[in-house]
């Protein structure tokens, strides 16, 4: 449990699968009214790491979007591990933080007290957006 909580400080931006980036893509880049409405519906929940509107409204009905969700679940932990253990860019959190619904810049600051950890969170957000973007040619 402790190991899982150590890496969650930057991993699940917007919920499992880092779907905050997909929510913002739906909100700002979608060509269809359905995906844009889903982005409007899901942005409030995604800011508090609740991604069920996006998972069930977007990913479940478009199985092609399961691929980037799986890729983010594989790539982002590797990125966080490299930036915390090998490069030592951001500190490893020293405590368990179970308020998963706390928005990520706030929870990252509370658990690490480090600007570098917030930068790592933003790096993970950009990587997740780059993973979702080619798959989400939102019609």
Say what each PLM segment does.
Residues 48-49, 89:
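A structural signal for short secondary-structure junctions
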Residues 16-47:
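Membrane-embedded helical hairpins/re-entrant loop segments and their flanking transmembrane helices
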Residues 1-4, 21-23, 41, 55-139:
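Transmembrane alpha-helical segments and their short flanking loops
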Residues 1-14:
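Alpha-helical transmembrane segments and their membrane-interface boundaries
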């Amino acid at each position: 449990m402790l190991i899982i909580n150590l890496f969650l400080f930057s991993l699940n931006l917007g919920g499992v699968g880092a779907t905050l980036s997909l929510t913002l893509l739906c909100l700002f880049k979608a060509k269809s009214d359905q995906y844009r409405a889903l982005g409007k519906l899901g942005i409030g929940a995604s800011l508090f790491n609740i991604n069920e509107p996006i998972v069930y409204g977007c990913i479940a009905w478009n199985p092609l979007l399961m691929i980037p969700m799986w890729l983010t679940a594989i790539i982002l932990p590797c990125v966080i591990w490299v930036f915390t253990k090998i490069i030592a860019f951001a500190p490893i959190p020293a405590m368990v933080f179970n308020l998963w619904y706390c928005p990520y810049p706030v929870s990252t600051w509370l658990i690490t007290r480090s600007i570098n950890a917030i930068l790592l969170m933003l790096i993970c957000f950009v990587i997740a957006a780059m993973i979702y973007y080619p798959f989400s040619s939102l019609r």
